Amino acid sequence: MVLATTTVEDFDRWMKVFSSTSADKRKHHGSKGSLVFRDPNEADRVWVIFDWDAEGWQSFVSDPEVPPMLKNAGHKSKPQVLTLAGELGS
């Protein structure tokens, strides 16, 4: 699992790219899906939980086609990433 947050110029524009071109690219790098959250305190902040291992994520962010895709989606900042450190049963 990978948790990422970023700020975007326009959520609808970002979501259009995230759910199409970016989804295809993520799948190519092993992503099995994602959950998207909007921040209630910052209208331009998006949080995403990816069903993705660290190697797949690293492969994705190292792909030279990704930075132009992020720019096209309207990212205002570079995504900040946290990796799942553990999972508890309750």
Feature annotation, model-predicted:
Residues 16-35, 53-84:
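An amphipathic, aromatic/His-enriched active-site/gating alpha helix that lines ligand/cofactor pockets
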Residues 84-90:
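Short, low-order "capping/linker" segments at domain edges
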